[in-house]
Amino acid sequence: MNNNTRRRGPQRRKRRGPLRLIMTIIIAAAICLAIVALCIYFSGVRYIKIDTADGGFVKFFGVVTDLGEPTRGKIVYSNGVTAEVNLERESIIYSNGDTYAGELRNLIKEGQGKIIYANGDIYEGEFLGDSIHGHGKYSYVTGDVYEGDLVYGKKDGVGTYTWIDGSVYTGEWSDDKKHGRGIYTWADGSSYTGEYALEQKHGQGDYTYANGDKYSGSFTNDTREGRGTYTWINGEIYEGDFKSNTINGSGKYTWPSGRTYEGTFENGVIVRNEET
């Protein structure tokens, strides 16, 4: 029995060696982590998460002031977009190539600012809750320009859209579409002043054609429909019903000589002779 006891003693001592080594490594690692954490803390680096009004969030990891306010670092949005932010310079560089310079509040765009998109589009104006919102100017890479009211990135309110070919629309917008009263002047010289509904001439309006002809009256879904007056540049005048852009129904036609016809028309043709 004494011999067995002597054999076990050294084995126990051998087992303690690796255990002590593992414990030493763990303690050393914990101390290193604590030192790193303290260094990060005293260097002003922090992690901050801010909830946004739309139910999303913005995560920030970077340098803060003594008051805990972010200054520069990396931000991650709830939609997965990442960016480098420098609040001292009021700038954000997004991972997709977009850049922003302007006012920020809680790490999001709010106030006056300018954003240059990776595709070449540029917006300069008001922001709210990280969205284009308010009055501003949007310049498209195509050369088109919109200046006016915007609601969460869409044309809404009153504004002017200028196409690269020189065509211009000034008037009311809703949900990114011409809607309400407006004036549209085309590059060829034709123009329309009147009511719009969802991008189409709809309601009462006046249309002047490039050749000088004029129509004043009712429109439905971008076509002359209902009662109206069409005046040709040669002096002829028609007052009456229109259907699908064509003289259809009852009306009065007056020639420059003073001769008139009042009666029924079908597809622009007189169907009863009632000339005076």
Regions found by a protein language model. Give the residues of each.
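Glycine/tyrosine- and acidic-biased, solvent-exposed loop/turn segments at the edges of beta-strands
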Residues: 2-276
